[in-house]
């Protein structure tokens, strides 16, 4: 969650309150698939709930994508969230964000609030097709973010290993309603480019363990949030239960907890 949306350690205070109710043991630095395996958890506990989110990000599919100055929006938002002082963070002067979801909006607005001179959010389709809510789109523009629709990234420009700009091709829909490039190119200067074109389930989380059924890049669950593995439930962004929003993840957790209770009582 972007730092400007939840101030004063709101989420941490919520966690602290719940943990203090008692009967909860917290183990940190235990990465699923590395320090701890799903198969081992299934042997040790009657029920396992996976709320692992989507830890990987989609690639732009461009050459030199590993250039300095080309970052994952999700990773950057996480770093900002954990930073003790946002005032000490450096931010680029000219920033281009690629994507049309709430994550793209978050990093664009956050960059502007941190002092970036020029922030442009780009999306390959129109505003109606953006997964970001209309409220979020309007908020970005009132925050000083420029939004450019109907452009798709084609190539990155660099100097001495650092991104200096990005080439876009204008897009349109063909008579069948499919997206296509028009051949018209546009160049945008940038010293920072953020990728926000969707997240993926991280394969390594199931390393060395039986893998639950996965469809469309997400863990498959039934109406009770049960996975294909006995004794394993899942919820949040890692399953397709609705919108990829915090409130949806919280609701998934509540419903899964009730399901686990019914199964074990």
Residue ranges and their predicted role:
Residues 12-63, 155-167, 192-194, 199-202:
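Feature captures the FAD/FMN-dependent oxidoreductase FAD-binding
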Residues 29, 50-52, 73, 98-100, ...:
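Generic beta-strand/beta-sheet core signal
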Residues 60-64, 108-110, 133-134, 205-209, ...:
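Short amphipathic alpha-helical segments
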Residues 66-92, 176-243:
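FAD-site-proximal beta/loop scaffold in flavoenzymes
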């Amino acid at each position: 969650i972007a730092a400007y949306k939840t101030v004063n350690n709101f989420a941490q205070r919520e966690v602290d309150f719940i943990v203090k109710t008692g009967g909860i043991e917290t183990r940190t630095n235990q990465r699923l698939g590395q320090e701890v395996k799903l198969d081992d958890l299934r042997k040790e506990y009657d029920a396992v709930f996976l709320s692992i989110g989507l830890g990987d990000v989609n690639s732009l599919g461009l050459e030199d994508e590993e250039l300095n100055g080309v970052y994952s929006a999700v990773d950057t938002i996480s770093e900002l969230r954990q930073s003790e002082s946002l005032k000490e963070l450096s931010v680029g002067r000219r920033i281009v964000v690629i994507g049309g979801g709430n994550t793209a909006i978050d990093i664009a607005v956050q960059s502007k609030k941190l002092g970036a001179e020029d922030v442009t959010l780009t999306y390959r389709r129109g505003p109606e097709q953006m997964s970001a809510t209309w409220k979020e789109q309007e908020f970005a523009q009132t925050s000083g973010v420029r939004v450019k629709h109907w452009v798709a990234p084609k190539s990155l420009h660099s100097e001495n290993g650092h991104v200096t700009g990005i080439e876009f091709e204008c897009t349109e829909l063909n008579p069948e309603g499919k997206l296509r490039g028009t051949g018209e190119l546009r160049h945008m200067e940038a010293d920072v480019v953020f990728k926000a074109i969707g997240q993926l389930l991280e394969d390594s989380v199931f390393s060395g363990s039986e893998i639950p059924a996965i469809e469309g890049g997400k863990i498959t669950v039934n109406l009770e949030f049960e996975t294909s593995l006995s004794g394993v439930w899942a919820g949040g962004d890692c399953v397709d239960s609705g919108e990829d929003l915090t409130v949806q993840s919280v609701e998934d957790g509540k419903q899964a907890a009730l399901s686990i209770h019914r199964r074990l009582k």
